Amino acid sequence: MPKLEMMLLVLLILPLSYFSAAGGQVVQGDLHSDVLARYLQRGDRDARECQVNTPGSRWGKCCLNRMCGPMCCPESHCYCIYHRRRGHGCSC
């Protein structure tokens, strides 16, 4: 089989693996959400305490403590301050 025909065959078959047999819906594995859910279920962690810095997106960073700019503070009693020339940072 020539290379072009083989490539077209692969391009035709490859997208089929992304559809479920039930209704042709795209199957999207959401590994990040699954890992986060398992993490939050351990111990006394609760998803309601999770502060996501990108509302409406399931790919945002989750902080169980206070958020400070793009990062999570390491402890619950920390607060966020702004350092001139260095940006936001946690003060504990």
UniProtKB/Swiss-Prot annotation:
Location in the cell: Secreted
Modified residue annotations for 4-carboxyglutamate: 49
Keyword field contains Cell division: no
This protein's GO CC annotations: extracellular region; host cell postsynaptic membrane
Modified residues (4-hydroxyproline): 55
Disulfide bond entries: 63-72, 68-80, 73-90, 78-92
Family from the record: Belongs to the conotoxin D superfamily.
Functional summary from the UniProt entry: Alpha-conotoxins act on postsynaptic membranes, they bind to the nicotinic acetylcholine receptors (nAChR) and thus inhibit them. Through its two C-terminal domains, this homodimeric protein would bind to two nAChR allosteric sites, located outside the nAChR C-loop of the principal binding face and at the adjacent binding interface in a clockwise direction. This toxin specifically blocks mammalian neuronal nAChR of the alpha-7/CHRNA7, alpha-3-beta-2/CHRNA3-CHRNB2 and alpha-4-beta-2/CHRNA4-CHRNB2 subtypes.
Name of the protein this chain belongs to: Alpha-conotoxin-like Rt20.2
Organism: Conus rattus
